[in-house]
From Swiss-Prot:
One of its GO terms (biological process) is cell division. It is a single-pass membrane protein. It is found in: Cell inner membrane. Inhibits cell division by binding directly to FtsW to prevent the final constriction of the FtsZ ring. The keyword Cell membrane applies. Induction: Induced in response to DNA damage. This is Cell division inhibitor SidA. One of its GO terms (cellular component) is plasma membrane. Interacts strongly with FtsW and to a lesser extent with FtsN.
């Protein structure tokens, strides 16, 4: 169960990072 939580947290972190980069790119563009 700990492993699943860690994997989910990692997935959310990656998605959040990509979303943030896309948002910044749109603001700059």
């Amino acid at each position: 169960m700990i492993r699943v939580a860690r994997e989910s947290f990692a997935l959310v972190s990656v998605i959040g990072f990509v979303w943030m980069m896309c948002t910044v790119a749109n603001l700059v563009a």
